A protein has these predicted regions:
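Glycine-rich phosphate-binding loops of nucleotide-dependent enzymes
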Residues: 1-212
Length: 212
């Protein structure tokens, strides 16, 4: 950006069944790294490989279909839709070959959507609109949505931001269980060091675009 390298010469691996924390100050290059992995930003050089498949140069939706999921610092759901409909929409997107093929999600893979909600403890609230949920519950729904494409790698951008300590621990314990149950690889950024030390299997530190 502006002639400066936001990320320069970094290299690391994330194994299946592992939570890897990527930490560093604001502006260190964490978000840039995430955006290169999921195709939102191009890289000048290098390689990003998932299960033997090169991701660099691919479009974000193609990378998503190949098995890279993401959650965001501010949870993203359709507030006017129910919890169940949000997950059904994600499943419909995962199944559709073209956006123009989307149809109403009301009956789409209901059982699969309910199974995902059960994994995050939200099946009892399936018919509630997301607009009335507590924020901790919205984060659980977002996690279920992120599982819709059966990801091999999940990117979690400051997953516990804005959450109370009890909610933080519940969300990360739930994430840890998904890692175990699904053999999922998770790369997450986090500013709360208590969360990092409690839940990360490994920690890498980024500063000024370089690993230290």
């Amino acid at each position: 950006f502006g002639g400066n390298r936001a990320v320069d010469g970094i290299g690391f691996t994330v194994a299946a069944g592992e939570l890897l924390a990527l930490i560093g100050p604001n502006g260190a290059g964490k978000s840039t790294t995430f955006n290169m992995v999921n195709g939102q930003l191009p890289a000048d050089s290098g390689s990003i490989v998932l299960g033997g498949v090169e991701l660099l140069g691919r479009k974000p939706r193609e990378i998503w279909k190949l098995g890279v999921g993401r959650t965001f610092q501010i949870a993203e759901t359709f507030a006017s839709l129910t919890v169940l409909e949000n997950v059904q929409m994600a499943l419909l997107s995962a199944d559709a070959k073209l956006y123009s093929m989307w149809r109403r999600a009301a009956d789409h893979r209901r059982d699969d959507a309910m199974a995902l909600l059960a994994q995050v403890g939200m099946q009892a609230q399936a018919e509630r609109p997301c607009s009335v949920l507590a924020y901790g519950d919205v984060k659980r729904v977002e996690l279920a949505i992120a599982m819709a494409n059966a990801p091999k790698l999940l990117l979690m951008d400051e997953p516990t931001a804005g959450m109370a300590p009890k909610e933080r621990n519940e969300l990360m314990a739930l994430t840890k269980q998904l890692v175990v149950d699904r053999g999922l690889a998770v790369l997450f950024t986090e500013h709360s060091m208590d969360v990092v030390f409690a839940y990360a299997d490994r920690i890498i530190v980024l500063a000024r675009g370089r690993l230290i």
